[in-house]
Design a protein with these regions (language model features):
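Short, positively charged and aromatic/hydrophobic N-terminal segments
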Residues: 3, 13-16, 21-22
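Walker B catalytic acidic pair
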Residues: 140-141, 152
Length: 348
């Protein structure tokens, strides 16, 4: 994986406004100054998070891509591998509002979104905001809550607002739901429905650290986020400015066709219950644009698509066969995706 700050290869591409004239370097879509500012913002975030998250540079990179794309993130892994610490490291490196919701079986939807309470003095109902009203929301162990409570996140993840008693209430910007969950075969968990899974831009897995990285963690005795001393290195305004640039990152027609071929191939793949939705295809486009921006480019390459197919599509696909071990489904889906991508010609 290439990281911001690495030298970029010279790339030639077509500008659709030039009648097919081949251009090199940066385009007019994103100004050089704005691109540089966005790159520097995420360089600072990356450096800050790596101080805490040892040996997981690719995971950190995907988290930042998700943030830049304005999406939501689901991290699924065993207890104790750093899911919550990853969320705290992101939140503490930004100057923004943060809240944590511990999902349990007795959590109610109103505990998440808020509730209208009658105010005797005002002689009217007043809306008391829930913890969902923050910029970074850690939905910890989301699959321990009932499906009814999980569904409380559907509207806010899609529309950045919650509706209580028929009245819509907008959440702040930027807004990112960072959800964690234990594997579905753990006792006391409720699998997220497909409609909920589709709201997440990516699903990531952290895994155990390498021996050297784990030894460094043991030496530093950083157990839990309370011991982490971090300072904010980016403001909400800087994040919003970078997010606004993502949609301006250029995607050549041939790269869009390449993306669409991958999407279409998942719909005819016999191993999958159903293929990727239109929302899924748009999610991959948005993530690819964000990755290009973080790497200092204002145009998308096929490599951006290839690197993100797994994190963006993996949780949106399920195996067609009736019975299977849940622990085997993810690698089987990833294997099928790799086969699909490998069979599609890369545009020149």
């Amino acid at each position: 994986m290439i990281y911001v700050g690495a030298p970029l290869p010279a790339t030639r591409r077509f500008d659709p406004r030039s009648g097919g004239r081949i251009l090199g370097g940066m385009s007019e879509f994103v100004s050089t100054a704005a691109l540089t500012d966005a790159r520097k913002t995420f360089e600072r975030l990356r450096a800050a998070m790596r101080e805490t998250i040892k040996g997981k540079d690719e995971v950190v990179e995907m988290v930042l891509i998700c943030l830049a794309a304005g999406g939501h993130l689901l991290v699924e892994d065993l207890p104790g591998v750093g899911k919550t610490t990853l969320a705290y490291s992101l939140a503490r490196s930004m100057d923004c509002a943060f809240s944590r919701i511990q999902f349990t079986s007795d959590l109610l939807p109103s505990d998440v979104t808020g509730v209208s309470i009658y105010d005797d003095a005002a002689k009217a109902f007043v809306f008391k905001r829930g913890p969902i009203f923050a910029n970074i929301v850690l939905a910890d162990e989301i699959n321990r809550a009932t499906p009814k409570t999980q569904s409380a996140l559907l509207e806010v993840m899609d529309r950045a607002r919650v509706t209580v008693d028929g009245v819509p209430h907008a959440v702040g910007s930027p807004f990112l739901v960072f959800a964690t969950q234990n594997p579905v075969d753990y006792e006391g968990t409720f699998p997220l429905p497909e409609s909920q899974m589709d709201r997440f831009l990516m699903r990531l897995h952290i895994g155990y650290p390498q021996v050297g990285d784990e030894m460094e963690i043991l030496r530093s005795a950083r157990i839990g986020y309370d011991a982490i001393q971090m300072r904010a290195v980016a403001t909400s305004a800087e994040i919003l400015a970078a997010q606004a640039l993502v949609s301006q990152v250029y995607i050549e027609e041939s790269v869009l066709e390449y993306l669409l071929k991958i999407v279409t191939a998942t719909r005819t793949e016999s191993e999958f219950r159903a293929g990727i939705s239109v929302r899924g295809g748009l999610a991959l486009r948005q993530a690819a644009q964000a990755r290009a921006l973080l790497l200092g480019r204002d145009f998308v390459l096929p490599d951006d698509i290839q690197e993100l197919v797994g994190p963006v599509f993996g949780h949106r696909l399920g195996l067609a066969r009736g019975s299977f071990d849940p622990r085997e489904e993810r690698p089987a889906v990833v294997s099928a995706l790799k086969r699909i991508v490998g069979a599609i010609a890369i545009p020149n």
